[in-house]
């Protein structure tokens, strides 16, 4: 290159491949309050040092690529690169490490969960130098979280809208999830709401199929809501699933729900996508609709302990993208969920400030500042005998959702709903009187059966039903 055409970028440039750790492993780095921090569970390929593996994660999820490029000289790499600043071995696991990476805030578009995930997990998980990679947790700084609207309304506003306080809310997923006509579906909703539930729900894959088009379902469910409200004097709702094949169609369904005057709609946020979810959440805030979120597809991403992304990360992302409810497992039901881990991400959904607590899987202190909280929904294989444990585990700010545990009642849907409501009221009263739900739960339910034949019948049907399998995802030994 002649002196006339030589540029600053070309001075000192040396083509070739160099170790990631020379640039991206910086154990001396002190994290900034504005950094997004990530904790990755890294399993390197044999022969790859943990420092190189951690640095590769930092590089490939920020500014790096596989070879040196001359355009590095056109920017400030130190300002924009991700940094692997700490590595610790995972106790009890061979060749597995927790690698901590700090990302400068300027790497991310404001108010975009889509962009955040595209950067942090979009490409690096296919990297050949790693046998497996899992994103365990993220620290979202207030500087970034304040660029998001968050939940459309939040816990307190929802309680005020419903005029319901001092207890968990009760819900039911209509079963069978597929195959009912719209009129029969609406009838099931009415019976459950009349029997004592606060909400009924579309299942995640109820969209607009040949046997039940969405508009018909919305109309019959709205009729069920208004009829049940008139009879009970309580505000009722049904999660009308607005998830659709396009964002435009999704919004059309949400607009129709608002025109019907119903209080809440629903979205499958992982299959529907974060861009669609954020748009729907903004519409819901502007138009007074609550937003229920289903996490369909989450276990594809989060169930394996050594690869993927933990649900606590998906939960934080949902709080940022927007939702008033989100499914969070049950601990005691048919779906995966270890108690301490579940309580960790439940706090991350509901609370304003959550301290680091590795015993519950929380890797970073998280400050949400003024962002509203999300109500966790316990759903999946639960019935009246689980009510004391659910009330004790999840507390008042939760939705306890019994699908088969309502519709499977031998006397029908309304008695099934009544059984659940009586069981809940008995547990809340016992707790308020100072009784130990964990120790005395069965006695509390049995005593309530004396005053409720519906509850007694439910207890008899499900007395031997248990789901006793060890969870796959457990807390690391610290």
UniProtKB/Swiss-Prot annotation:
The UniProt record gives the binding positions of Mg(2+) as 201, 203-204
Give all N-acetylproline modified positions. Answer: 3
What is the recorded name of this protein?
Answer: Ribulose bisphosphate carboxylase large chain
Catalytic residues at 175 (proton acceptor), 294 (proton acceptor)
Cofactors (names): Mg(2+)
The gene that this protein is the product of is rbcL
Cellular-component GO terms for this entry: chloroplast
Q: Which Pfam families match?
A: RuBisCO_large (PF00016), RuBisCO_large_N (PF02788)
Please tell me which top-level EC class this enzyme sits in.
lyase
Give the record's subunit note: Heterohexadecamer of 8 large chains and 8 small chains; disulfide-linked. The disulfide link is formed within the large subunit homodimers.
What this chain does, per the entry, is described as: RuBisCO catalyzes two reactions: the carboxylation of D-ribulose 1,5-bisphosphate, the primary event in carbon dioxide fixation, as well as the oxidative fragmentation of the pentose substrate in the photorespiration process. Both reactions occur simultaneously and in competition at the same active site.
Task: Tell me which residues bear N6,N6,N6-trimethyllysine.
Answer: 14
Q: What is its main location?
A: plastid
């Amino acid at each position: 290159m002649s002196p006339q055409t030589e540029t600053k970028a070309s001075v000192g440039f040396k083509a070739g491949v160099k170790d990631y750790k020379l640039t991206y492993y910086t154990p001396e780095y002190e994290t900034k309050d504005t950094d997004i921090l990530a904790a990755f569970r890294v399993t390197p390929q044999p022969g790859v040092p943990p420092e190189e593996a951690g640095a590769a994660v930092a590089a490939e999820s920020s500014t790096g690529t596989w070879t040196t490029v001359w355009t590095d000289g056109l920017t400030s790499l130190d300002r924009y690169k991700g940094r692997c600043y700490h590595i610790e071995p995972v106790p009890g696991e061979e060749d597995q490490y927790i690698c901590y990476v700090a990302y400068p805030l300027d790497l991310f578009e404001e108010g975009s969960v889509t962009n955040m995930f595209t950067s942090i997990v979009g490409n690096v998980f296919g990297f050949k130098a790693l046998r497996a990679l899992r994103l365990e947790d993220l620290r979202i700084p207030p500087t970034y979280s304040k660029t998001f609207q968050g939940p459309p309304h939040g816990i307190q506003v929802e309680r005020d809208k419903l005029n319901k306080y001092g207890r968990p809310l009760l819900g039911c997923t209509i079963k069978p999830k597929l195959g009912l006509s719209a009129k029969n579906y609406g009838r099931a909703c009415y019976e459950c709401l009349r029997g004592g539930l606060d909400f009924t729900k579309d299942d995640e894959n109820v969209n607009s199929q040949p046997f039940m088009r969405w508009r018909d379902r919305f109309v019959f469910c709205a009729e069920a809501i208004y009829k049940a409200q008139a009879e009970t004097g309580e505000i009722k709702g049904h999660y009308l699933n607005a998830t659709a094949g396009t964002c435009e169609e999704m919004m059309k369904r949400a607009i129709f729900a608002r025109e019907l005057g119903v209080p809440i709609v629903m979205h499958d946020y992982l299959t529907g996508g974060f861009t669609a979810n954020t748009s729907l959440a903004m519409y819901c805030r502007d138009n007074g609709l609550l937003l229920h979120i289903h996490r369909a597809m989450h276990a594809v991403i989060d169930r394996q302990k050594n690869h993927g992304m933990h649900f606590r990360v998906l939960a934080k992302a949902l709080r940022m993208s927007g939702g008033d409810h989100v499914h969070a497992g049950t601990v005691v039901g048919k779906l995966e969920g270890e108690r301490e881990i579940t309580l960790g991400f439940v706090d991350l959904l509901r609370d304003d400030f959550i301290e680091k607590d590795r015993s519950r899987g929380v890797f970073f202190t998280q400050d949400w500042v003024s962002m509203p909280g999300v109500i966790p929904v316990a759903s999946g294989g639960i019935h009246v005998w689980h009510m004391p444990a659910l009330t004790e585990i999840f507390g008042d700010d939760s939705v306890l959702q019994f699908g088969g545990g309502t519709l499977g009642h031998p006397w029908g849907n309304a008695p099934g709903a009544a059984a659940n409501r009586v069981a809940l009221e008995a547990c809340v009263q016992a707790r308020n009187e100072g009784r130990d739900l964990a120790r005395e739960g069965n006695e509390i339910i049995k005593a309530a059966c004396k005053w409720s034949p519906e509850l007694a019948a439910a207890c008899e049907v499900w007395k031997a039903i248990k789901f006793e399998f060890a969870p796959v995802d457990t807390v690391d030994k610290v």
